[in-house]
């Protein structure tokens, strides 16, 4: 029997390797989505918090000076940044539910 016939008779000898590769690709894509989400949260949440506090909350409803509005908005943005970083660190440390690290050889 030639090697060509052996491969044809062997069925799907490459299927487990293909499935394993798809599994790794799926895990990589899931990790990429998670990191991208937290990066966007860390970048955009403080900026949005600053402008929402400044433009809609503090200027509209409170009668305080412009400097105090800017300071309060900046403090709110720093708090929002720390919350986003805390969420990322919590997720990185404790991991997602059901995502146990498993070693496959």
From Swiss-Prot:
Top-level taxon in the UniProt lineage: Eukaryota
What residues form the membrane-spanning segments?
A: 37-57, 69-89
The primary location reported for this protein is: endoplasmic reticulum
Q: Which BP terms from GO are recorded?
A: vacuolar proton-transporting V-type ATPase complex assembly
Task: Using the record, list the residue span of the signal peptide; answer none if the entry has no such feature.
Answer: none
Query: Pfam families, alphabetically?
Result: VMA21 (PF09446)
Q: Give its localization.
A: Endoplasmic reticulum membrane; Endoplasmic reticulum-Golgi intermediate compartment membrane; Cytoplasmic vesicle, COPII-coated vesicle membrane
Topological domain, Cytoplasmic: which ranges? 1-36, 90-105
Lumenal compartment spans: 58-68
Q: Where is this region: Disordered?
A: 1-26
Give the family this protein belongs to, as stated in its UniProt record: Belongs to the VMA21 family.
PANTHER family from the UniProt entry = VACUOLAR ATPASE ASSEMBLY INTEGRAL MEMBRANE PROTEIN VMA21, VACUOLAR ATPASE ASSEMBLY INTEGRAL MEMBRANE PROTEIN VMA21 HOMOLOG
Record function comment? Required for the assembly of the V0 complex of the vacuolar ATPase (V-ATPase) in the endoplasmic reticulum.
Put simply, this protein is called: Vacuolar ATPase assembly integral membrane protein VMA21 homolog
Please give the organism: Drosophila yakuba
């Amino acid at each position: 029997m030639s090697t060509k016939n052996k491969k044809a008779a062997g069925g799907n000898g490459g299927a487990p390797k293909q499935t394993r590769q798809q599994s790794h690709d799926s895990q990589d894509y899931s990790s990429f989505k998670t990191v991208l989400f937290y990066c966007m949260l860390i970048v955009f949440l403080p900026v949005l918090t600053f402008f929402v506090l400044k433009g809609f909350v503090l200027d509209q409803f409170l009668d305080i000076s412009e400097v105090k509005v800017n300071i309060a908005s900046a403090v709110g943005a720093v708090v929002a940044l720390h919350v986003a970083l805390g969420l990322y660190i919590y997720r990185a440390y404790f991991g997602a539910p059901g995502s146990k690290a498993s070693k496959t050889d």
